[in-house]
Amino acid sequence: MPPKLRNFDKSMEKYTDVVLVVKQERFYVSRAILSEHCTYFQSLFCGDSNYQEHIISDVEPQDFQKFLEVVHGEPAIFEATVQKILPLAQKFGSKTVLQKCERFLITISTVRLSTKWNLAKQYGLDELQAHCKLEFKTAQIVRKNPQPEPKSLAYSDKFIFDHSFEKVDGLAEGDMRRSQPITHLDFTWTIYITRKNQHLRVSLCCGKAHLTSDWTVRADFKMTLTAKGSPDLVSDTKGFFHLDSEKNFYWELGQEVEWDEIRDKCLADGKLEVETRVRIVKIRELPVEEFKPPRIVTVNAVKSYEGVLPPTKVLFGDFPFPKALAKEKPDYSDYIRVTPLTQQAKTSAPAETPDLQTPPRQQASAKPQASPAKSAGAPQLPQKVPLFPSGGAPSSPSAPEAPSEPPPPKIYPTLGANAPPAPPVQGKKFILKNVFGNVEAMKCHTAMACQKAVAYDFEWNLIISQKNNRLHVSLCCSKSNVTSEFRILADFELIIAGKNGGRPLKSKTNGCFNIEKTKNSSQELGQDVEWSTIVYDYMVDGRLTVEAHVNITRVTCLDAPKFKKLRNFDATGNSWDVMLIVAGQRFFVLKEILISNSARFKNIISKINFTAAPSTEIKLPDSSADHFQNFLEACYGDPSINDDTVHGILKIAQSYEAAGIVKRCEEYVIKYSKKTLEQKEKLAKHHNLKTLKAHCDYWKSRRKCC
């Protein structure tokens, strides 16, 4: 049996009003607490309130000790005690204890499923019964399909490796450095850094020795650049590494950071420390003999195809040449159609499928001839062709005649004083549309924005910016004179109109806009597109038409309380003998509960003469009334500790020396919290939680060993 978490011996006689005798062992408890949680004791104490002792039969003292600990909010439910506590909870009619045992059996317990089912039926635990039924169905599916799908090899693994680059401050424009490669799951992994266009690209490369087949490796990875005296620079990337056996070609994925930011924040004596945490999601081998249809490029879209060809997934990520294998007649509505730039033999597409051999940028201009030297190496972008004036045509006779251009749409000046105001938009669904002028003259690190429209009490507008030979198209949400913090969840689709009536470029995003409590707060979300793609396929006489279809799904005010009250501490319908005043709000509580949980309240209450004033007011120092509400609920044994309330409860508990509540909060963060390791470590340092700090240190050391 686990050790005692709370004493109910003679030392508590001064603060209790009734004694329960269980097989000659005496438990000093409070009538009010037991009556609050148990219908049995509510009836027992109702008749004769002056009787000081009651005998409890057919109960073991050690089991009753654990039951009382759970009633008083202690974490006393374990594998060794749950089946002892359940019959007492049913005997004494305690719904709170039954719910805690049920939650333990669902989320933590490792006993057999049949044992859980029997306990659920015996004690009427409906949620546990539903959980067991779901587990039974899952087990039946596993038994029916014991063998994995043979078509693809699936691996799931995580690893971390880091490297310290020396003399990074001496990198010249175009210089590249790489780390020593490591081998994991028969693949080699290398970190690259490259300085180009006043940026430093930090990337991860995946390769394989003796490449005889094509491979795709799906991986999610986080790259951390250690900063000096400021938060580290962290970037998350999800993508596919494609290994081409024919060209012996490897992929690299990564992010770009401004060189000035790297130099000012991350370089210490010329050293740059890079840590990469990689999670391999899936590895698939594509044998050479498999038929390879024409390749297509997708922009931020993920689709799966199953048909005549082997089932594959669209490859996506931050790399210049995403590729995919399509089935015979796929839907090309969301794709930009191009030809493999180093294709050796021209293949003709079926008549039913769209023309995949001539990309839109080459249908309106002469197709540049690729040199044999470039064809033998990695894929290269087509040479930049000059832009022709309105109505003009390229000089190449092989290009088809361009269709007549429709009348130009009305152009709104961007960020101009004379721009017509956008009409107000009503409802949760709306469309923003703007024609940006003189886009071809945009320089690097410049931006244009359209007029703002009002929807759902927030201001919305479209923004385009040029950076690193890419055009960033984004939707911006803002609000002036913000008095509260807001979080806006929205689904939106950005559409760039095609050139000469061509296929538009679409990208869908599920975004969260965070509006902070400042004078003018805004946030933008969007997508990046290659600048050459914009120039050749979507820009008409320097104009670019952008449209956003927005659906606001949820607006949350972060200043609103993140919890609902589990218990009302008002004067009606509540047993109380002392009133606490916190930030002007009154809490009617029992002094026995305060004394049993808090050493500071024990000291305060011991100095008050309750004989002269049976119901006394105690005014406490100002603090958050919401946090104090959660703290009192925890003292009463309610499950009020969660990720949203744990910080506030810890603050109040440490202020009033409630060691038991602090211990429960610490145990919750270690066992149940979904906070990140960094957030847990910050919480441990802020509240000086030694056990939680040791827990975080242990898992940090495990990370470094991986």
UniProtKB/Swiss-Prot annotation:
Residues 359-380, 389-402 have a biased composition (Low complexity). Keywords: Repeat. SMART domains: BTB, MATH. The keyword Ribosomal protein does not apply. Residues 165-280, 455-552 form the MATH domain. Residues 16-80, 576-644 form the BTB domain. Residues 344-419 are annotated as: Disordered. It comes from the Eukaryota. Gene3D superfamilies: Apoptosis, Tumor Necrosis Factor Receptor Associated Protein 2, Chain A, Potassium Channel Kv1.1, Chain A. Signal peptide: none annotated. The keyword rRNA-binding does not apply. This is BTB and MATH domain-containing protein 47.
